[in-house]
Amino acid sequence: SAALAGTIIAGASLGFQILDKVLGELGKVSRKIAVGVDNE
């Protein structure tokens, strides 16, 4: 049904937003680690 499809799409888009945020945070952490290694 259309309602189910809408729910799935909303859930998928929310999932992508969360994933994007998590990947962004991991990217910051790995840059910090890389900078820390360079500084030693």
Swiss-Prot record:
Subcellular location: Secreted; Nematocyst; Target cell membrane
Disulphide bridges, residue numbers: none
Top-level taxonomic group: Eukaryota
Location of the region described as Plays an important role in the hemolytic activity in the Swiss-Prot/TrEMBL record: 3-12
GO cellular component: extracellular region; nematocyst; other organism cell membrane; pore complex
UniProt record, GO biological process: cytolysis in another organism; monoatomic cation transport; pore complex assembly
Keywords: Cleavage on pair of basic residues, Cytolysis, Ion transport, Membrane, Nematocyst, Secreted, Target cell membrane, Target membrane, Toxin, Transmembrane, Transport
UniProt cross-references to SUPFAM superfamilies, sorted A to Z: Cytolysin/lectin (SSF63724)
Molecular function via GO: channel activity; toxin activity
Region (N-terminal region): 11-30
Cited Pfam families: Anemone_cytotox
Subunit relationships: Octamer or nonamer in membranes. Monomer in the soluble state.
UniProt comment concerning the protein's domains: Composed of a long N-terminal alpha-helix and a core region rich in beta-sheet structures. Before the pore formation, the alpha-helix binds the lipid membrane, partitions into the lipid-water interface and stabilizes the monomeric molecule on the membrane. Finally, it traverses the bilayer, thus forming the transmembrane pore.
Function: Pore-forming protein that forms cations-selective hydrophilic pores of around 1 nm and causes cardiac stimulation and cytolysis. Pore formation is a multi-step process that involves specific recognition of membrane sphingomyelin (but neither cholesterol nor phosphatidylcholine) using aromatic rich region and adjacent phosphocholine (POC) binding site, firm binding to the membrane (mainly driven by hydrophobic interactions) accompanied by the transfer of the N-terminal region to the lipid-water interface and finally pore formation after oligomerization of monomers.
Protein family (similarity comment): Belongs to the actinoporin family. Sea anemone subfamily.
Full protein name: Cytolysin SmT-1
Originating organism: Stichodactyla mertensii
